[in-house]
Curated annotation (Swiss-Prot):
The modification (3R)-3-hydroxyarginine is found at R81. The keyword GTP-binding does not apply. Keywords: Hydroxylation, Methylation, Ribonucleoprotein, Ribosomal protein, RNA-binding, rRNA-binding, tRNA-binding. One of its GO terms (molecular function) is rRNA binding. Part of the 50S ribosomal subunit. Cross-links to the A and P site tRNAs. Interacts with assembly factor DarP(YjgA). The lineage of its organism: Bacteria, Pseudomonadati, Pseudomonadota, Gammaproteobacteria, Enterobacterales. Is hydroxylated on Arg-81 by RoxA. The modification is nearly suppressed when E.coli is grown in anoxia. This is Large ribosomal subunit protein uL16. Belongs to the universal ribosomal protein uL16 family. GO terms for cellular component: cytoplasm; cytosolic large ribosomal subunit. It comes from the Bacteria. Binds directly to 23S ribosomal RNA and is located at the A site of the peptidyltransferase center. It contacts the A and P site tRNAs. One of the last ribosomal proteins to be assembled in the 50S subunit. The simultaneous presence of uL16 and bL36 probably triggers ObgE's GTPase activity and eventual dissociation from the mature 50S ribosmal subunit. It has an essential role in subunit assembly. InterPro entries: Ribosomal_uL16, Ribosomal_uL16_bact-type, Ribosomal_uL16_CS, Ribosomal_uL16_dom, Ribosomal_uL16_sf.
Amino acid sequence: MLQPKRTKFRKMHKGRNRGLAQGTDVSFGSFGLKAVGRGRLTARQIEAARRAMTRAVKRQGKIWIRVFPDKPITEKPLAVRMGKGKGNVEYWVALIQPGKVLYEMDGVPEELAREAFKLAAAKLPIKTTFVTKTVM
């Protein structure tokens, strides 16, 4: 599972997920999976989508993960009263804005890439679309 090796602070404020995305172009591979919606991806969701893609292409070609879960999400245990401090870090998320390229792929035919990204998109909680590299 993806998570930072070390952070300056253990816990983070909730914050807001507004603004425009960086990393909107396919830069490593030939095909990409781009976010259309806004939301957050957990490390488990990122890994589940990666596994689905890897199995779909039968481990040929190359896959790049363009998102990293760097925001800790805390939860208080069940049946615990409010107060007494912030809860423990339970999982890590990556904040996603529309237009962000989540995954890239190269070394496979376009039809196979489309099928793999379709399987991966089913594992994710946000709407996505298939994109190809544009040559200028």
